[in-house]
Amino acid sequence: MACVSPSYWADVPGQFKAFIDRCTPWCNTHEPHAALSPGKKGYAIALRTGPGMKECERIMDSIEHFFGHLEIQCSGHLGLCSVEYREAVEARQEEIEAFCRMIMEEGERTDEA
């Protein structure tokens, strides 16, 4: 599962929090709870307009915390700072593509196992 979130005042936006709330029946803090099949992997991606990575790290930590309650292993994260316009993302294309390749390669290794 890949979760991507922009920074809204140093946190995930309300829509993302609503998504997390909707997943409560599958969280290990809710008894009895449904469960996802074991072995799921997650990837946390955060972006913000400001230059500091600390805010992205907070968002990625929130996503990783969510994964933990779903018993999903966080297998990677990517923080993108100073992203206000499309051009800023285009300038990071190689980094984003490398991250996506890493996800795909990890998936292929899992399929082979």
Which residues fall in each region the model found?
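Helix-loop-strand module that forms the ligand-binding subsite of alpha/beta enzymes
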Residues: M1-H65
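Glycine-rich phosphate/pyrophosphate-binding loop and the adjoining helix
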Residues: E57, D61-A113
